[in-house]
Structures are given as structure tokens and as C-alpha cells.
């Protein structure tokens, strides 16, 4: 038992150190008033500039082609490849990976520490992150491989990091091609001067796979902990009992061949639509307060009050961090689902996953934000995390909302 406790303590220390490195304040910007501070984390430095670069490089493609996103999402599979999935199924799987504690407790934390103005910066991070999602998912499609175990395709950042070479001269219209597995055939068919240099990035692929394993294992534990805590607070069910049920249900899904897609294909749309419908009901029920909530979101994002009070940095950084954590644009999880899709062109899956970022942050995160902001202060005073969101739901819809 002592050895087990020491191992757990060591794991906690490692995770805490990594969290501080990635999400902690790498450096702090202070303005002339001495009170307004921006704590800039490493991931914000990497993901936000990358998102802006991709947005400009693609000429604001996710915004220009938004109607096309919806159209290609509804397309059927381009072939009957056994084990492959459609673009819509890939979107559902990616949405299942995105939607979680970032959309619930993460939104609550952003508003608790950054105020209503943090919601605006979450929206902005989604608009920027959609371009990153487009690029990473398109690359996953280009470098996907046949899955010998389950059929269909598999891929993701670890695959294209391992196989991708630095391309120094390719025509713009040839950046996204259906198949670049055979470089010689591609060059010969297009009569294109094609230069590559360097070697495969095998080390980066392995590093990503290892870090992804640690990350997603930790995220699963966070979600499970929040679920067990919620059931304990709402119904008094012991956390161990809920944990056992979750483990059994997860095993039944994961260990059965191709069961994950089938289950998510049914559960995710129902849960997302139900959550959206509940939020719409709450908004209509409190429609007279909606202008006040919207005014608070924009005024606290840009107004003089947070600037003078020194809270602007907290508003911006909490909104941006929680937005990035929620939509996972740039984290590399969604491309794994994108690679499994069977589409006629890689860009189509890039567009579909960009739409997934919009759904995650602009729709589902906004639902959580409005549920919380439309609840009076006395109903949620002194609460944090899921307890706060449950209290807000209890105020709006009684015990049914808590469920």
C-alpha cells in the first residue's frame, strides 16, 4: 500500500509539473497602471499564433466555406470500404472527444475566474482554432494508412509526423492531394518539379504518441471523477459504485470490434441535442434577462471596468485557455478520428473538423455559459466546478436539471 501511495504521489508531481509548464504563466506582462497583468502560458504562445497564421494562410477558409462545411458533413461515404466511417461519423467521434469537462466545468471555471467577458474570448479562440483543426485533420487524411486490425483507415499526428517530409516547392493547388504515398507516381503524373529534403520525423511521432497517451488517460480520469462526484452530490451514490459501472460500460464498448463508432453515432447526437434543447428552454424562460447577459459578456470583455480594475488579463487568459482546452484545436485528438473517415478529398474532412470546433465552443460551451449566467448570484454563491453548474441547473429546472 505504501509503494502504491508513493507511485501515485510521483504521478501527481509529474502531472502537476507538466501542467505548470504547459498551462502555467511562462511570463507575465504588466501594464503601466501596475494592476493589469497578462499571464502568458506556453500553449497559448504556440496555439494562438499558429491559429492566426493558418487563418491568414488559408485566407480565412473556415469562414469563407462555412456553407460548404455543412454540405460535406452530410455527404455519404465515397466507397464501401469495410471498417471505414463517413465524414459525419468522424465528426461525431471528434465531437465526443472534444465535448467533456472543458464544456461544463471548464466554462464554469472560466467565468468564475474571468467573469462573463471570458465567454467572448472563448468564442474568439474557437474562430482562430478552427483553422488549426482544418490543417491538422487534412494532414491526417493525406497520410492515413490501412488498418490491418479493424479494417478501414487509421492515422493522426503521430502518423504524419513519422511519414511527412519537408516539401520546399509544390504548387498551391497541389498541397492537398488524394494520395501522396507514392511520391514518384505523384511527380510523374503531374510533371511537377518536386523537391524534398531532410528525413522522416520519427522521433516527433513517437513523442506525440507517448504524450497523447498520458494526456488522454488523464482526461478520461478527470471526466470520470466529475461524473462520480456529480452522482454523489445529486443522489448520494457512492463514487466507487459509479466508477465500477463506468468501467464496465466502457469495457463493453471499447473491447468490442467497431462498437465505439456505433455507440457514439447514437449517443452523441442525442446528448448534444438534448443539452441544446434544455438551454434553449432556459433562455426562452429567462428571455427578459438575455440582453443583460449579452451586455455583460461584451462589456466585461472590452469595457473600462476590467481594465481599470486590473482584471482584463484574467478575463482574456481564462477565456482563451478554457477555449483551447475545450475545442482541442491543435491538440491532435480530432485528427485521429478524421483519418478514419472515407471521403473523396482530404480537404472535406478538414472542413468537417473545423465545423466540429464551432459546434464545441460556439454552441455547447455557450449553452453552459448561458445556463450559469442566467442564474441569480444567490443560487450559485460559494460554489465551484460541477457543483456550481448543478446548482444553476437546479434553479432553472429543479431536480430534472440536476439529472
PLM region spans:
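N-terminal alpha-helical transmembrane segments of multi-pass membrane transport
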Residues: 1-101, 111-118, 129
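Transmembrane alpha-helical segments and their short flanking loops
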Residues: 2-24, 116, 144-149, 163, ...
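Select transmembrane alpha-helical segments in multipass membrane proteins
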Residues: 44-50, 85-94, 197-214, 243-244, ...
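Membrane-interface loop-to-helix entry segments
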Residues: 46, 54-70, 204, 208, ...
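Helix-loop-helix module between adjacent transmembrane segments
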Residues: 53-55, 96, 125-153, 158, ...
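Alpha-helical membrane segments and immediately flanking helix-loop junctions
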Residues: 80-113, 139-142, 149-164, 203, ...
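Selective recognition of specific alpha-helical transmembrane segments in multi-pass small-molecule
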Residues: 128-136, 239-257, 268-288, 321-324, ...
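Extracellular/periplasmic helix-exit of transmembrane alpha-helices
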Residues: 136-145, 280-296, 304, 310, ...
Amino acid at each position: 500500500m505504501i509503494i502504491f501511495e508513493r507511485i501515485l504521489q510521483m504521478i501527481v508531481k509529474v502531472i502537476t509539473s507538466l501542467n505548470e509548464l504547459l498551462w502555467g504563466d511562462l511570463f507575465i506582462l504588466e501594464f503601466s497602471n501596475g494592476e493589469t497583468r497578462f499571464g502568458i502560458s506556453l500553449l497559448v504562445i504556440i496555439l494562438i499564433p499558429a491559429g492566426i497564421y493558418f487563418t491568414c494562410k488559408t485566407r480565412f477558409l473556415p469562414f469563407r466555406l462555412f456553407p460548404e462545411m455543412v454540405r460535406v458533413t452530410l455527404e455519404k461515404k465515397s466507397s464501401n470500404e469495410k471498417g471505414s466511417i463517413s465524414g459525419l461519423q468522424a465528426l461525431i467521434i471528434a465531437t465526443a472527444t472534444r465535448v467533456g469537462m472543458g464544456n461544463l466545468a471548464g466554462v464554469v471555471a472560466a467565468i468564475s475566474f474571468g467573469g462573463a467577458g471570458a465567454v467572448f474570448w472563448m468564442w474568439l479562440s474557437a474562430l482562430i482554432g478552427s483553422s488549426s483543426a482544418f490543417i491538422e485533420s487534412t494532414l491526417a487524411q493525406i497520410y492515413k494508412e490501412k488498418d490491418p486490425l479493424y479494417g478501414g483507415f487509421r492515422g493522426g499526428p503521430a502518423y504524419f509526423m513519422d511519414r511527412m517530409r519537408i516539401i520546399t516547392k509544390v504548387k498551391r493547388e497541389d498541397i492537398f492531394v488524394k494520395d501522396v504515398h507514392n511520391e514518384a507516381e505523384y511527380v510523374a503524373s503531374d510533371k511537377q518539379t518536386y523537391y524534398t529534403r531532410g528525413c522522416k520525423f520519427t522521433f516527433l511521432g513517437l513523442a506525440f504518441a507517448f504524450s497523447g497517451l498520458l494526456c488522454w488517460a488523464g482526461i478520461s480520469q478527470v471526466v470520470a471523477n466529475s461524473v462520480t462526484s456529480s452522482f454523489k452530490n445529486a443522489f448520494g451514490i457512492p463514487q466507487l459504485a459509479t466508477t465500477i459501472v463506468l468501467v464496465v460500460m466502457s469495457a463493453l464498448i471499447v473491447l468490442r470490434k467497431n462498437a465505439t463508432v456505433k455507440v457514439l453515432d447514437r449517443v452523441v447526437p442525442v446528448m448534444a441535442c438534448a443539452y441544446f434543447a434544455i438551454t434553449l428552454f432556459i433562455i426562452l424562460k429567462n428571455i427578459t434577462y438575455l440582453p443583460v447577459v449579452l451586455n455583460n459578456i461584451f462589456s466585461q470583455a472590452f469595457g473600462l471596468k476590467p481594465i481599470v480594475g486590473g482584471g482584463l488579463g484574467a478575463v482574456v487568459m481564462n477565456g482563451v485557455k478554457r477555449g483551447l482546452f475545450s475545442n482541442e484545436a491543435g491538440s491532435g485528438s480530432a485528427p485521429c478520428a478524421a483519418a478514419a473517415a472515407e471521403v473523396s478529398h482530404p480537404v472535406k474532412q478538414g472542413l468537417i473538423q473545423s465545423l466540429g470546433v464551432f459546434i464545441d465552443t460556439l454552441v455547447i460551451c455557450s449553452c453552459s455559459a448561458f445556463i450559469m449566467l442566467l442564474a441569480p448570484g444567490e443560487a450559485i454563491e460559494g460554489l465551484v466546478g460541477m457543483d456550481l453548474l448543478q446548482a444553476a441547473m437546479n434553479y432553472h429546472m429543479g431536480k430534472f436539471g440536476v439529472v
